[in-house]
A protein has these predicted regions:
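Metal-dependent catalytic neighborhoods of phosphoester/phosphodiester hydrolases
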Residues: 71-77
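Structural motif
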Residues: 25-27, 59, 146-150
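Zn-dependent metallo-beta-lactamase
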Residues: 1-46, 174-177, 187-193
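Residues that act as N-cap/strand-start positions at coil-to-secondary-structure junctions
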Residues: 12-14, 112-114, 133-135
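Short hydrophobic/aromatic-enriched beta-strand-loop microsegments
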Residues: 80-85, 150-152
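Metallo-beta-lactamase
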Residues: 34-40, 47-68, 75, 83-128, 134-193
Length: 193
């Protein structure tokens, strides 16, 4: 089962993280933004990690390393954090205005770097979806109802996703599967425009 959890807002715009209840344990996709820092625009409003998100997760998967997606990583020292190698390298060597270095590299960070598609657990796979960042990845989850895509910021809206403007968007559209975006409360099967 996949569950969304509100993790931050900007000007009322929600940012969700997701939990995957897997037979091997709980997987957390992105960790939101649990507090603020002077480096951030005051329009960003952090949300404490929801009480219903357990801290004893099997692993974390970051779709990318922008602050609203990895800001809670430091709550999970020693827990494997799956990320594309390109994303981690870019966050460390070419940070942009959405990168908070101390939230990427923190005491106890246990990154597992991937170079392309990978299976994290049976039925939980990573798909590189470059566009929003060069190392962005989506998470593909096999459920009893079929494939579900956790798309992160592959697009900010389903309308944008439908344009297929980036390589990552085209990869997700080709799956024709229910897709969660980080800013959408519910999944939708995206349609090309």
């Amino acid at each position: 089962m996949i569950r969304p959890h509100l993790a931050a807002t900007v000007k009322g715009f929600p940012v969700y993280v997701h939990t995957i209840e897997h037979a091997d344990g709980l997987v957390l996709v992105d960790t939101g933004m649990i507090d603020s820092t002077p480096e951030l625009d005051e329009n960003w409003e952090p949300v404490p990690m929801p009480e219903n998100v357990p801290r004893d997760v099997l692993c974390v998967i970051n779709t990318h390393l922008h602050f609203d997606h990895c800001g809670g990583n430091r709550l999970f020292p020693g827990v494997p954090i799956h990320v594309q190698a390109r994303e981690l390298a870019d966050a460390r060597t070419e940070p942009d205005e959405h990168t908070v270095n101390s939230w990427v590299d923190f005491d106890g960070a246990a990154y597992v770097e991937h170079d392309g598609e990978a299976e994290v657990l049976p039925g939980v796979r990573l798909l590189p979806t470059p566009g929003h960042t060069r190392g962005h990845q989506a998470v593909l989850v096999d459920t009893p109802e079929g494939l579900v895509v956790l798309g992160g910021d592959v697009a900010y809206s389903f309308r944008e996703l439908g344009t297929g403007a980036t390589e990552g968007q085209r990869r997700v559209l080709a799956l024709a599967a229910p897709t969660w975006l980080a800013h959408a409360e519910r999944p939708k099967v995206p349609m090309p425009r």
